[in-house]
Regions:
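Divalent-metal-activated hydrolytic enzyme cores
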Residues: 67-115, 138-139, 149-167, 184-266
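Bacterial N-terminal signal peptides
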Residues: 55-63
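Short, positively charged and aromatic/hydrophobic N-terminal segments
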Residues: 29-35, 39-42
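Cationic, amphipathic, low-complexity segments that mediate targeting or membrane/lipid association
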Residues: 8-9
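Short glycine-enriched loops at secondary-structure junctions
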Residues: 122-128, 147-150, 177
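Polybasic, lysine-rich low-complexity intrinsically disordered segments
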Residues: 3, 14, 37-38, 49
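Bacterial N-terminal signal peptides that target proteins for export
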Residues: 45-55
Length: 266
């Protein structure tokens, strides 16, 4: 039996497979050893077709194992929370995502309540999927998305307060991003919108007046606008107090839509 396995294993195309997936060989050898006494495989004389069927079984088992997402402990301090976000983004930008806490067990775990360790005020732009770009799972980040990541409204600040006061997040990130359509429209001298969009652009425009008509300064306008939102949040005494007491970090950041990387601005 073992000789038959060695013969098939030595065939070039199968040897190539095992070089690529060594764990599959270990599983198949285990199957052979455990079934040798019952002479199950002797019925087929371990021909190539049977062996490839066993390989298929090995792949199924390996796939099921890979579907069990790795778990990591959640951060317990503001500094750890920020580090976890940045580490997750590094994994994302390097195509090494682990997709933690994203299975049905996590769905069931978070169904009764949420306890995110971070909050992110980001843009509504479809190119900025917050949980994905930080490689975080279900219930990890409280996400507040508005056009232009603007916090200049009671509704948005109400969401920020909820994250800080009731959910107890340890870090709040205001995330601007490259090629932001809201800021682009706000600094464009030729833009004429109506209704709600006009009101939205006026709100952003108030923060970037020095850049109106200067399309070449878009990136500077985006960075400035992001910093203004952080200043606006920090102007609330209860937020500033938590930061001063070491209970919370409030940071501005920038997401590069070309590279997938997040950079802190302060």
């Amino acid at each position: 039996m073992t000789n038959n396995l060695a013969k098939v294993e030595s065939q070039p195309e199968i040897s190539l497979f095992f070089n690529e997936y060594p764990s599959a060989l270990g599983l198949i050898k285990l199957l052979v050893v455990n079934t040798e006494k019952n002479e199950i495989f002797l019925l087929m004389n371990m021909n190539k077709k049977l062996f490839l069927n066993v390989i298929g079984l090995a792949i199924v088992v390996m796939t099921c194992t890979m579907c069990q997402r790795p778990t990591t402990s959640l951060p317990s301090s503001p500094e750890e929370a920020l580090a976890e976000l940045l580490a997750g983004n590094e994994r994302y930008a390097n195509e090494q995502c682990i997709n933690p806490r994203s299975d049905m067990d996590r769905v069931e775990e978070t169904a009764p309540h949420q306890a995110p360790f971070a909050a992110v005020v980001g843009c509504s732009d479809s190119r900025v999927p917050v949980e994905l770009l930080f490689d975080q799972g279900i219930g990890d980040i409280f996400v507040i998305r508005t056009a232009g990541n603007n916090v200049n409204s009671e509704m948005v600040m109400g969401s920020v307060d909820y994250a800080i006061e009731h959910l107890g997040v340890k870090v709040l990130l205001v995330l601007g991003h490259g090629s932001c359509g809201g800021v682009t429209a706000a600094i464009s001298a030729g833009e004429h919108e109506h209704g709600n969009i006009a009101h939205l652009l006026d709100t952003i425009r108030n923060d970037v007046r020095d850049y109106i008509g200067k399309a070449e300064s878009l990136d500077k306008a985006i960075l400035h606008h992001t910093l203004v939102q952080v200043d606006r949040i920090m102007a609330y005494p209860h937020v500033a107090e938590k930061v001063e007491n070491g209970e919370l970090l409030v940071k501005p950041a920038y997401y590069d839509v070309n590279t997938g990387k997040v950079s802190l601005l302060q």
